[in-house]
């Protein structure tokens, strides 16, 4: 596995991708997936306007990475704790969407992962639940089982997400076109 930084990896498409942070401007976060651990760097600021983002994104590299620009759901605070990615050991996670009722996800989380919660988002609960399934079923099967359970038992606008570890990157593209959040413009 070769380590590269994201602008090099994405090439000319990176500047277009960065424009997304003008709308998704509540925070940005970068997870670097290395063989033994995931490292997260995040800031409560728009990536497009952040000097720190420019420095970090150009100078950090890893065999795998996740970059997230957050557009906070109404009622959820814009804080460092609520910024994505979330990580545990060598696993990092980002999510775009909304689960409902998201506090009910807490009942699915193993006690050993409950104490990892720092913020108050559905995304973090989603991640902690996936960790529960991963521990019980392995990385790939745990993610598949967790997504299937959320899809069948929760209302959601989307559970679009990415989860990475030192061996795998799983991308979930799942949304309900009939349950579009009322607070978004039709972009």
Q: Which ranges hold each PLM region?
A:
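Conserved short alpha-helical segments that host acidic/polar catalytic motifs at enzyme active sites
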Residues: 1-187
């Amino acid at each position: 596995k070769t380590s590269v930084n994201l602008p090099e990896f994405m090439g000319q498409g990176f500047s277009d991708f960065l424009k997304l942070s003008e709308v998704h401007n509540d925070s940005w976060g970068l997870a670097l997936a290395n063989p033994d651990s995931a490292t997260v760097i995040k800031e409560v600021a728009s990536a497009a306007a952040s000097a720190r983002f420019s420095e970090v994104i150009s100078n950090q590299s890893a065999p795998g990475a996740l970059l997230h620009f957050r557009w906070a759901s109404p009622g959820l605070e814009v804080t460092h704790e609520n910024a994505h990615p979330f990580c545990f050991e060598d696993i990092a996670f980002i999510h775009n969407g909304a689960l409902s009722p998201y506090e009910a996800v807490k009942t699915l989380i193993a006690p050993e992962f409950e104490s990892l919660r720092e913020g108050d988002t559905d995304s973090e609960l989603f991640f902690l639940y996936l960790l529960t399934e991963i521990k019980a079923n392995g990385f790939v099967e745990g993610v598949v089982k967790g997504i299937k359970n959320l899809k069948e038992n929760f209302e959601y606008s989307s559970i679009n997400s990415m989860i990475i570890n030192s061996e795998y990157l799983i991308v979930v593209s799942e949304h309900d076109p009939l349950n579009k959040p009322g607070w978004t413009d039709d972009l």
